[in-house]
Amino acid sequence: MIQSQISQNARLALSEVILLAKARKDLSFAQITEGTGLSEAFVTAALLGQHPLPASAAQVVGDKLGLDADGIALLQTIPLRGSIQGGVPTDPTIYRFYEMLQVYGTTLKALVHEKFGDGIISAINFKLDVKKVDDPEGGSRAVITLDGKYLPTKPF
């Protein structure tokens, strides 16, 4: 039976256990994801308490990380989502995304509405991908793809 969380506490505690096991076993999120049939971004979000995993994926992940039956079951619960608490984020990496939306948020909104009409980009019917590519000027660049279904506003 599908279960749901009413607070973030249990999933946050499990995330701490998961991250310790990941470090202890020297695993990457990509390695943990292998065999689940899901994307690295989705599994990572689930491990950080933002999505439930299907039973088969939870078992694969749990086996790799050495989670007990309760941990594997908890990975399958629907979490109370939202990982950034307390307003403006203080972590530098997360803050840069916040900053990008502060600078480009209204631009994104204007372009989405101009190209699609009044509506939103779904974060439910959604795909996320992060790639590291070489920068022709030296170093590396991050290519982050946000791929969400457009949902038009419907008058009622």
Curated annotation (Swiss-Prot):
Q: What is its EC number?
A: 4.2.1.104
Against CDD domains, the record matches this protein to: Cyanase_C
Q: Which UniProt keywords apply?
A: Lyase
A Pfam family name for this chain? Cyanate_lyase
An example Gene Ontology molecular-function term? DNA binding
Which positions are catalytic residues? 96, 99, 122
Name the InterPro entries on file: Cyanase, Cyanate_lyase_C, Cyanate_lyase_C_sf, CYNS_N, Lambda_DNA-bd_dom_sf
SMART domains in UniProt: Cyanate_lyase
Enzymatic class: lyase
Reactions catalysed, semicolon-separated, are: cyanate + hydrogencarbonate + 3 H(+) = NH4(+) + 2 CO2
Q: Which GO terms describe its biological process?
A: cyanate metabolic process
The answer to whether UniProt assigns keyword Lyase to this entry is yes
Its annotated function is as follows: Catalyzes the reaction of cyanate with bicarbonate to produce ammonia and carbon dioxide.
Which family does the entry's similarity section mention? Belongs to the cyanase family.
Under which name does UniProt file this protein?
Answer: Cyanate hydratase
This protein's species is: Pseudomonas entomophila (strain L48)
